[in-house]
């Protein structure tokens, strides 16, 4: 395509909205960023990332390939260009292609499609994170040269949307394609940059995308009224009686299998006489995987069997813990898969044990799963107890908002097989899905006589209130619509809708009904997000989805926190469902008697809780306990409670009450957001005070010796003077001088012994090392420490200033410095014997590539802190020292560090 023609076509792309202030800030600087041919934007959901990406494409003004992670997101790009940038939507077909074989000025495809084209694949693929309307891409790229095609098309710009969420083989194809175009312009867009990835993966990401140019955060968007004040709420549910029976049956089967294995005399003898305990495995190798040695001793101890006590001394533990599922899982994992040569089981014996475990579903992909297994997790994540939870959330939200409620419930599956039973009060709800949630809430509205209009909105099934029919016919040509009864529902209440033609029109029209209040609750699937769908009216979102990536969770959450122009007081609640099993059996630990085990407790980890924990690592939100904005599950403040059914039920009641105080929520955000410009998100690292190294006192010691020498000479002088004057008294100024000097020395010692001061000095030492090697390039950064009272057991440190990546680099370096010694390449060893937990520290990975880097890091640390020598652990002497360091680390296995994000003012 000729350059002039290309420019003329691009002139037709013109944003028909008004740029927000932070968007305009990015656009004002984009020419500068584009000077090197790259622009890399990190932007929270709701910031208009896709819209900015389209504007960047226009600015570069060259044929462009946009790559998206899924088919649904690919469609979002098409919809956004059509609705927001084209005066005549009919021109979209001339401008946009979704087919790699037939590129146009803007070609939009998935990463998977590009990978398939690069390897010339023929076939189809079902995408992950989808519902009944599976995202299936059909490929026939045999004999197709995608690189040659786009070179002929004069490809000038490559736009990558969330490119780090890729499988390794897709990455390789993307890199090969990118490297085929030496002078191509790059646009990179993401809401979740891989800050915490391995340095090699981060380098790969930055090599592809370029350094991050701009970042737009959620708090910034709330501050500028581009996103509404919002809060995440956690609601606990419990399995039904039938599910409890199934869970109990799983536990009993597991208990029987484990009893048979652990009580087998041959099994016990093999463990007792294993190679690990009879000198056939080196001490060095045993300490490579100390958990397997620990599990072996714990098992034998629980059986009352003898074992060489020197191995317990090697682990530096005086008392072994009782055998439980976790330790037995570790033992079986080691014996069957990880270190089978430590044990003496024959092939037939291993085969028999594996068969026993598989029969109870306790092995998955060469991993022994006693604490958690797929069957049990599936029962919990898909527990029908969540139906009741959503009912209660709906009732509470309606009580709070009444006719103003606009609730969206997103789930994974439609469950069309239940459609004929909709409206049948006696029909049993047996699966979670769009239709079961619809029916559950519908029954609740009938029971409470609540006049709430519900709707089902998915790619293949739409149900609306009959009262909204005429308005829908106003929005769409009535001749294109077909209304049918659905299931056993009264046609006067609900109708199923078909549309002849483009289904996007129906989705848009039903969304308009939602906006106007003809519908108050929409139940849909995640695929709805890919329909170019947006509904700013949403003020209550229930994430009833248990399948999905963080990226998709981010998208779902972003739908609820958009502002509504005609409702400036809008706030939004986001609900997360957690199914937990509270049991009265001993299946958690079949190795203990019921008399010594709690009668009612949280039975095992919840997969929902694990998912929530992952989600909250990146989501910044308002803390429950104070008006601060931070990430992490700790902000919900339920870590202090015992997980009993009574406690969790009470917590649910408190959560519902809190969720109804929407005015307080808005006020909380107002107080939490700094009133200053240029707010900053920092990554706080909490560190146990016991492991913070001590400050070096060489300068103090020198000062003390010099002072004592001076004092001694002065005393001698005054004694002679006294003798000569026959006064018989040492002048009082000697004593005063002595007290002042000793007081100053004691004050210096007192100040430098505080964890706050020590951590500040350590942080600055690590910062200096990172600056010296250009891992941090922003000079205007500062290490800050949060000071607590003297009874605090931990202290927080963070890097203020710099880019988010530089903050992540600092955070990772601090975490790696304090990490338990395992098999690090370089470690630091205190030159003088110490009695606390500060004998050994690890050299962070960034400095472990070679000795000179490691030595430079060690010099920065030893310059201000207690003297440490650098140890190379791959030498013979180094291995001996590493062994000692591991032993000390094993005796201190509790969590030493943790991290979270927090928003601070630049004045703090």
Per-segment meaning from a language model:
Residues 167-227:
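Post-DEXD/H (motif II) to motif III coupling segment of the RecA-like Helicase ATP-binding lobe
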Residues 44-47, 90-95, 100-107, 144, ...:
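Conserved C-terminal RecA-like helicase domain
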């Amino acid at each position: 395509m000729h350059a002039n023609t290309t420019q003329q076509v691009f002139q037709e792309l013109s944003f028909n909205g008004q740029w927000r202030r932070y968007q305009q800030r990015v656009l004002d600087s984009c020419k500068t960023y584009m000077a090197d041919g790259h622009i890399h934007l990190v932007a929270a959901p709701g910031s208009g990332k896709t819209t900015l990406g389209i504007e960047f494409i226009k600015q570069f003004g060259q044929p462009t390939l946009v790559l998206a992670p899924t088919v649904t997101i690919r469609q979002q790009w098409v919809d956004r260009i059509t609705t927001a940038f084209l005066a005549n939507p009919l021109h979209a077909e001339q401008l946009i292609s979704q087919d790699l074989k037939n590129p146009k000025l803007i070609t939009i495809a998935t990463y998977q499609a590009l990978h398939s084209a690069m390897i010339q694949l023929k076939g189809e693929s079902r995408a992950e994170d989808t519902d009944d309307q599976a995202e299936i891409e059909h490929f026939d790229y045999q004999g197709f040269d995608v690189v040659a095609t786009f070179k002929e098309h004069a490809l000038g710009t490559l736009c990558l949307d969330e490119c780090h969420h890729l499988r390794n083989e897709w990455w390789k194809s993307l890199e090969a394609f990118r490297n085929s175009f030496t002078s191509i312009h790059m646009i990179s867009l993401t809401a979740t940059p891989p800050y915490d990835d391995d340095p090699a993966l981060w380098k790969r990401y930055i090599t592809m995308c370029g350094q991050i140019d701009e970042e737009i955060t959620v708090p910034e968007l709330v501050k500028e009224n581009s996103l509404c004040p919002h809060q995440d709420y956690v609601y606990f549910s419990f399995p039904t009686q039938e599910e409890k029976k199934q869970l109990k049956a799983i536990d009993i089967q597991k208990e029987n299998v484990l009893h048979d294995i652990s009580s087998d005399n041959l099994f016990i003898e093999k463990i007792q006489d294993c190679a690990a305990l009879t000198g056939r495995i080196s001490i060095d190798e045993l300490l490579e995987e100390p958990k397997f040695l620990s599990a072996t001793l714990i098992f034998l101890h629980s059986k009352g069997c003898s074992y060489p006590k020197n191995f317990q001394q090697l682990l530096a533990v005086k008392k072994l813990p009782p055998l439980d599922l976790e330790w037995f899982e570790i033992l079986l994992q080691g014996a069957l898969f990880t270190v089978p040569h430590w044990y003496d089981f024959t092939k037939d014996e291993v085969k028999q044990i594996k068969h026993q475990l598989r029969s109870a579903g306790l092995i998955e992909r060469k991993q022994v799963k006693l604490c958690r297994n797929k069957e049990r997790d599936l029962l919990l994540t898909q527990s029908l107890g969540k139906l009741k939870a959503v009912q209660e959330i709906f009732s509470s939200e309606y009580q709070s908002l009444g006719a103003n409620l606009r609730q969206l419930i997103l789930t994974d599956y439609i469950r069309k097989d239940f459609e004929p039973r909709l409206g049948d009060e006696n029909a049993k709800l047996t699966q979670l899905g769009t239709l079961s949630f619809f029916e559950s809430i519908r029954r609740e509205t009938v029971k409470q006589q609540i006049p709430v209009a519900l709707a089902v909105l998915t790619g293949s099934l739409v149900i609306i209130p009959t009262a909204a029919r005429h308005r829908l016919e106003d929005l769409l040509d009535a001749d294109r619509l077909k209304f049918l009864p659905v299931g056993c529902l009264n046609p006067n209440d609900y109708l199923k809708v078909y549309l002849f033609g483009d289904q996007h029109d129906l989705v848009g029209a039903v969304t308009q009904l939602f906006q106007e209040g003809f519908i108050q609750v929409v139940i849909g699937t995640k695929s709805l997000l890919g329909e170019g769908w947006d509904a700013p009216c949403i003020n209550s979102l229930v994430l009833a989805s248990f399948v999905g990536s963080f990226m998709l969770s981010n998208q779902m959450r972003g739908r609820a926190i958009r502002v509504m122009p005609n409702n400036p007081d809008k706030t939004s609640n986001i609900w997360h469902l957690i199914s937990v099993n509270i049991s009265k059996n001993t299946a958690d630990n079949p190795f203990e008697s019921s008399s010594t085990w709690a009668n009612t407790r949280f039975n095992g980890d919840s997969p929902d809780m694990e998912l929530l924990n992952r989600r909250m690592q990146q989501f910044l939100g308002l803390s429950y306990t104070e008006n601060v904005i931070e990430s992490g599950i700790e902000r919900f403040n339920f870590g202090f409670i015992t997980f009993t059914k009574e406690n969790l039920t009470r917590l649910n009641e408190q959560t519902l009450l809190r969720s109804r105080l929407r005015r307080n929520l808005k006020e909380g955000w107002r107080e939490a957001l700094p009133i200053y410009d240029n707010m900053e998100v920092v990554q706080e690292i909490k560190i146990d005070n016991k492991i913070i190294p001590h400050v070096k006192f060489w300068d103090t010691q020198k000062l003390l010796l010099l002072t004592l020498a001076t004092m001694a000479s002065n005393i001698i002088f005054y004694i002679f003077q006294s003798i000569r004057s026959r006064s018989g008294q040492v002048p009082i100024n000697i004593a005063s001088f002595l007290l002042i000097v000793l007081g100053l020395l004691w004050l210096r010692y007192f100040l430098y012994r505080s964890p706050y001061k020590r951590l500040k000095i350590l942080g600055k030492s690590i910062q200096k090392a990172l600056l010296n090697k250009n891992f941090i390039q922003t000079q205007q950064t500062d290490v800050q420490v949060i000071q607590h009272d003297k009874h605090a057991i931990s202290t927080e440190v963070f890097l203020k200033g710099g880019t988010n990546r530089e903050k992540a680099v600092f955070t990772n370096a601090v975490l790696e410095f304090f990490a338990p010694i395992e098999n690090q390449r370089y470690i630091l060893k205190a030159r003088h014997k110490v009695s606390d937990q500060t004998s050994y520290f690890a050299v962070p990975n960034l400095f472990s590539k070679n000795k000179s880097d490691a030595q430079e890091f060690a010099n920065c640390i030893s310059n201000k802190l207690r003297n440490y020598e650098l140890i190379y652990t791959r030498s013979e002497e180094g291995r001996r020292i590493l062994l000692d360091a591991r032993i000390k680390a094993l005796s201190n296995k509790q969590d030493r560090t943790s991290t979270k994000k927090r928003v601070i003012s630049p004045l703090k």
